[in-house]
């Protein structure tokens, strides 16, 4: 749960990236970044011919901080696809966070690209020390048994269920309205 005096940012990295800033438990600002999981998944899918394999590649990719990055770049052939998108997202998110009239105390990461290992360390490094962590549903107990990636998949499942039940915003990342649903009634 968010503390009343805490100013936070939520970076949702799905098709496109959304940065939501919250202050005093109220949404203050929502901005979008055109880069997102879609461009990474599309690029990997073009080589692998499978979106599920592209997702698994992201899930099994580990990114490293500046000090140890050079030793591991050969380890994953898709780092060259994933890192530029994450770099764009993190730098634009940093600009958005720094432009707020109040200091952001914590950044939560969520969405498809948050399955990349060490992504919170990568964002912390670029956002200069603001604490970053993966957004976890409040009702799931934290324990060493639960893999952080399970939280991310639970977040996605909850969002899909809410959309499927007709709640939430129909134009958000998880549910696309059919063209016929967008037409005004006559």
Pin down the residues of each PLM region.
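Hydrophobic/aromatic-enriched cytosolic interaction surfaces used to assemble or bind macromolecules
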Residues: 1-186
């Amino acid at each position: 749960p968010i503390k009343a005096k805490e100013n936070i940012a939520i970076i949702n990295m799905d098709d496109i990236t959304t940065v939501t800033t919250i202050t005093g438990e109220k949404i203050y600002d929502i901005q979008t970044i055109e880069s997102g999981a879609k461009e990474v998944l599309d690029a990997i899918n073009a080589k692998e011919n499978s979106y599920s394999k592209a997702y698994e590649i992201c899930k099994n990719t580990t990114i490293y901080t500046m000090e140890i990055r050079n030793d591991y770049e050969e380890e994953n052939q898709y780092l060259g696809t994933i890192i530029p998108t994450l770099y764009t997202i993190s730098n634009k998110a940093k600009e958005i966070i720094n432009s707020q009239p109040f200091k952001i105390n914590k950044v939560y990461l969520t969405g498809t690209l948050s399955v990349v290992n060490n992504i919170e360390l990568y964002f912390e490094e670029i956002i200069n020390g603001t604490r970053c962590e993966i957004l976890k549903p409040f009702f799931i107990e934290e324990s060493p048994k639960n893999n952080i990636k399970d939280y991310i998949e639970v977040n996605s499942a909850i969002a899909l269920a809410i959309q499927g039940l007709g709640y939430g915003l129909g134009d958000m990342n998880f549910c696309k309205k059919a063209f016929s649903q967008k037409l005004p009634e006559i």
